[in-house]
Amino acid sequence: MNAPTPAPSPVDVIPAPVGLLAELTHRCPLRCPYCSNPLELDRRSAELDTQTWLRVLTEAAGLGVLHVHLSGGEPTARPDIVEITAKCAELGLYSNLITSGVGGALAKLDALYDVGLDHVQLSVQGVDAANAEKIGGLKNAQPQKMQFAARVTELGLPLTLNSVIHRGNIHEVPGFIDLAVKLGAKRLEVAHTQYYGWAYVNRAALMPDKSQVDESIRIVEAARERLKGQLVIDLVVPDYYAKYPKACAGGWGRKLMNVTPQGKVLPCHAAETIPGLEFWYVTDHALGEIWTKSPAFAAYRGTSWMKEPCRSCDRREKDWGGCRCQALALTGDAANTDPACSLSPLHAKMRDLAKEEAAETPPDYIYRSIGTNVQNPLSEKAPL
């Protein structure tokens, strides 16, 4: 009698995706210097049409996706945003609108509510209007955001404020907390900048020093106790000052997928920075086929790709080796240990780099823009 075939390791089983990040467009009225979009932004002419997005959502629901994050760019720049949101409701997908709250966002909010929008995440660049508008690169943005937030809570929609923290606004962390309470937000994300995409280009302008980071953490922890039951505060610390890396996107190809405006499906925001990966498009393949068979998703899924010290580490199924894109940017090899990990031989150098940049006078922001040839000031610097 043949021996039974052993069951595959739980690590090797491909789980159903939980979330879909639908980047409907890269168009955005803001020009934030930490934007996680790629440096080469998709133009409007390359964007997926309405029917393709509706098919993608239908396939996502069939795969078991629960949450759809309608993002961009600015998702309300799409004339079909109401139709797309209605499709989420029809399919039973929880819809989260990730928005700047400016431009045409307010004008479309009531219609989005009427078709079943579930949640709004509003980005706020600063508490002081002048500082916020300097960071976002758009004048008169702050009053629009406040009007938008007020209408969200008037409609009874749950509101999350997202504040990306860096040296230009880290002094405003107490103000972000007060603002979230004032606006009636249910949740506040105090998310220290993650240095990918445009943030990597602007790292020297954005990097705070460790004492500032530590103080911001202390403030958040105190506020969590003070506001328990009133406001949930999520805290994301910067990798450059962390002891262990984050599980990027919950683990490469384990929980989330990201569909770009032109239909390229990514395991994470910055995956396109890794050379040699083969990405599939929703115009050529069904979403389920991409999730289970795409070479890009298979490349760093699970643990078999890992080198030491990750391969034998007891945290390998907790943080999944950290961020592949950051490992590439800082070590030159996407399969190396993320240097955010204290077990990486390059961890101390990463800390030193942050310390050096935080001590320097910050350069001017290089603002996010479509159609501009961006010269990355870090491109000529050797990895760690």
From Swiss-Prot:
Its cofactor is [4Fe-4S] cluster. One of its GO terms (biological process) is pyrroloquinoline quinone biosynthetic process. Pfam families: Radical_SAM (PF04055), SPASM (PF13186). Keywords: 4Fe-4S, Iron, Iron-sulfur, Metal-binding, Oxidoreductase, PQQ biosynthesis, S-adenosyl-L-methionine. GO terms for molecular function: 4 iron, 4 sulfur cluster binding; cyclase activity; iron ion binding; oxidoreductase activity; S-adenosyl-L-methionine binding. Its EC number is 1.21.98.4. It catalyses: [PQQ precursor protein] + S-adenosyl-L-methionine = E-Y cross-linked-[PQQ precursor protein] + 5'-deoxyadenosine + L-methionine + H(+). The keyword Signal does not apply. Pathway: Cofactor biosynthesis; pyrroloquinoline quinone biosynthesis. Residues 14-230 form the Radical SAM core domain. [4Fe-4S] cluster binds at residues 28, 32, 35. PROSITE patterns: MOAA_NIFB_PQQE, RADICAL_SAM. The keyword Lyase does not apply. Binds 1 [4Fe-4S] cluster. The cluster is coordinated with 3 cysteines and an exchangeable S-adenosyl-L-methionine. Belongs to the radical SAM superfamily. PqqE family. Interacts with PqqD. The interaction is necessary for activity of PqqE. Catalyzes the cross-linking of a glutamate residue and a tyrosine residue in the PqqA protein as part of the biosynthesis of pyrroloquinoline quinone (PQQ). This is PqqA peptide cyclase. The gene is pqqE.
